[in-house]
């Protein structure tokens, strides 16, 4: 297999700042993760002299001196732009094969080079996610390269296929493949109060009631603004109850225990969210967190909502809509432009989001790997 990585892919350095910023900030809502990384880890003055598959940061390809492909490389890979994506993805979704325009040689070479780079990264990959138009063509080509590498010593092939003797099973180590995840946006002008300023349904006697506004435990500090409905911002005093709730959400959604994998780093992440007034919660009268939603990724006045979770004991009683609307109202006071993405098979969640004013503006895809 020719080494297309050396031929086409390079680490972005400070010379590419203007072009990278144009890519990221021209459409900030789907690019919030990459923007957050860019602002916290600016491009280096000079490109590092290490093999790219060991590099963590932005890499790209150029066409006629212009940046045409961008990929954020790390344990979590985010394809930000690919010069052939519009053609290939639109064709796959909307155009008959006989009428399909063909990708030019440069677009094909760039796609192959980026896929080959991920093949070299191998078992360090935890996930790949981003806009479907960029993720899915790259993921498809990556699987094809795994097939072509059959019998070789590709690290990613060994990750996806524990035993080469069993034949090529390029999904053997894929924990979850989620090709269709609607990207939703909540317009700032939406009236959320009508969803949360309501009487809650009656709950079974064995369930502790949600804590009503104004009945916070003595000494609890509300760092900013008023509660909305039954939701409020989490404080440092809530960490002990928030941690198991967040871990339960993560395990349900992703498929593994974040505390077991990330240890203290996961609790540190929650502390950061609390300190930044980015975690909205509902507790029961005993202080247990029964609902949560976070502004997981933020930039200026925009945030991506993550970690939406309702305790299993409280599901099926019509609480998700008023709790989530209240949490979104609180987060929107700090970040008027809220977005999130959700699995298309989660019909109940999709209905709840759309029923509280969220509108689809795009589509994400996520591939999660086992370690």
Regions found by a protein language model. Give the residues of each.
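Acetyl-CoA-dependent GNAT
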Residues: 73-78, 254-255, 264-306
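Conserved beta-strand-loop-alpha-helix junction that forms the acyl-donor binding cleft
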Residues: 129-135, 312, 340-351, 366-371
């Amino acid at each position: 297999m020719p080494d297309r990585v050396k031929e086409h892919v390079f680490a972005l350095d400070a010379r590419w700042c203007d072009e990278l910023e144009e890519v990221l900030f021209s459409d900030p809502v789907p690019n919030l993760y990459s923007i957050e990384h860019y602002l916290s880890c600016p491009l280096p003055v000079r490109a590092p002299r290490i093999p790219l598959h060991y590099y963590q940061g932005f890499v790209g390809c150029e066409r006629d001196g212009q940046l045409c492909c961008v990929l954020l490389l790390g344990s979590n890979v985010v394809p930000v732009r690919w010069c052939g994506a519009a053609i290939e993805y639109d064709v796959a979704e909307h155009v008959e094969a006989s009428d399909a325009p063909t990708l030019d040689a440069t677009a094909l070479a760039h796609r192959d080079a980026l896929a080959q780079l991920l093949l070299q990264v191998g078992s360090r990959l935890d996930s790949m996610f981003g806009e479907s138009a960029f993720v899915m063509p790259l993921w498809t080509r990556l699987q094809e390269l795994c097939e072509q590498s059959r019998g070789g010593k590709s690290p990613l092939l060994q990750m996806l296929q524990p035993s080469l003797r069993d034949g090529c099973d390029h999904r053997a180590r894929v924990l979850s493949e989620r090709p269709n995840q609607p990207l939703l946006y909540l317009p700032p002008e939406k009236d959320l109060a009508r969803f949360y300023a309501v009487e809650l349904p009656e709950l079974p006697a064995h369930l502790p009631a949600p804590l009503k506004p104004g009945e916070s435990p003595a000494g609890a500090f509300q760092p900013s603004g008023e509660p909305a409905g039954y939701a409020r911002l989490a404080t440092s005093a809530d960490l002990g109850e928030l941690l198991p709730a967040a871990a339960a959400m993560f395990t349900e959604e992703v498929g593994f225990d974040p505390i077991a994998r990330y240890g203290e780093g996961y609790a540190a992440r929650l502390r950061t969210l609390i300190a930044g007034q980015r975690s909205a919660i509902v507790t029961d009268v005993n202080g247990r967190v029964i609902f949560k939603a976070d502004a997981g990724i933020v930039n200026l006045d925009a945030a991506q909502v993550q970690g939406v979770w309702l305790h299993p004991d409280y599901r099926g009683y019509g609480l998700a809509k008023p709790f989530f609307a209240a949490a979104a109202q609180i987060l929107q006071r700090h970040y008027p432009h809220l977005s999130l993405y959700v699995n298309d098979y989660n019909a109940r969640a999709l209905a709840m989001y759309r029923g509280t004013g969220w509108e689809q503006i795009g589509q994400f895809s996520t591939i999660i790997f086992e370690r």
